[in-house]
């Protein structure tokens, strides 16, 4: 049997990859979104989650360094 999913290949440094894994494990976006962990710098994630993931990462970055955010 073959399963097919539309997804996006994400390339990142290992630290950001760990952040994505944490968001996935804690289901902070409502559900798990990582389809497959490929290696230390690549993840395959569900395509539909990308806009929500971008917003969540932007929110995290703003909270970490509010002065660096363009207003």
UniProtKB/Swiss-Prot annotation:
InterPro entries referenced in this protein's UniProt entry, alphabetically: TFB5-like_sf, TFIIH_TTDA/Tfb5
Biological processes, Gene Ontology terms: nucleotide-excision repair; nucleotide-excision repair, preincision complex assembly; transcription by RNA polymerase II; transcription initiation at RNA polymerase II promoter
Transcription in keyword set: yes
UniProt feature coiled coil, ranges: none
SUPFAM superfamilies the UniProt entry points to: TFB5-like
Keyword Nucleus on entry: yes
A Pfam family it matches: Tfb5
Keywords, in A-Z order: Chromosome, DNA damage, DNA repair, Nucleus, Transcription, Transcription regulation
Subcellular location: Nucleus; Chromosome
A single GO cellular-component term on record: chromosome
Disruption phenotype: Auxin-induced degradation of the protein causes no obvious phenotype in germ cells and early embryos.
Function text: Component of the general transcription and DNA repair factor IIH (TFIIH) core complex, which is involved in general and transcription-coupled nucleotide excision repair (NER) of damaged DNA and in RNA transcription by RNA polymerase II. In NER, TFIIH acts by opening DNA around the lesion to allow the excision of the damaged oligonucleotide and its replacement by a new DNA fragment. In transcription, TFIIH has an essential role in transcription initiation. When the pre-initiation complex (PIC) has been established, TFIIH is required for promoter opening and promoter escape.
Self-association and partners: Component of the 7-subunit TFIIH core complex.
Family matches, as PANTHER family: GENERAL TRANSCRIPTION FACTOR IIH SUBUNIT 5 (PTHR28580:SF1)
Family statement: Belongs to the TFB5 family.
The protein's name: General transcription and DNA repair factor IIH subunit TFB5
Organism of derivation: Caenorhabditis elegans
Lineage: Eukaryota, Metazoa, Ecdysozoa, Nematoda, Chromadorea
């Amino acid at each position: 049997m073959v399963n097919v999913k539309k997804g996006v290949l994400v390339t990142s440094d290992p630290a950001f990859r760990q952040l994505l894994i944490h968001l996935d494990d804690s289901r902070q976006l409502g559900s798990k979104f990582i389809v497959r962990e490929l290696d230390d710098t690549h993840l395959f994630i569900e395509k539909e989650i990308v806009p929500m993931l971008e917003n969540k990462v932007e929110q995290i970055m703003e909270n970490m360094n509010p002065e660096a955010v363009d207003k």
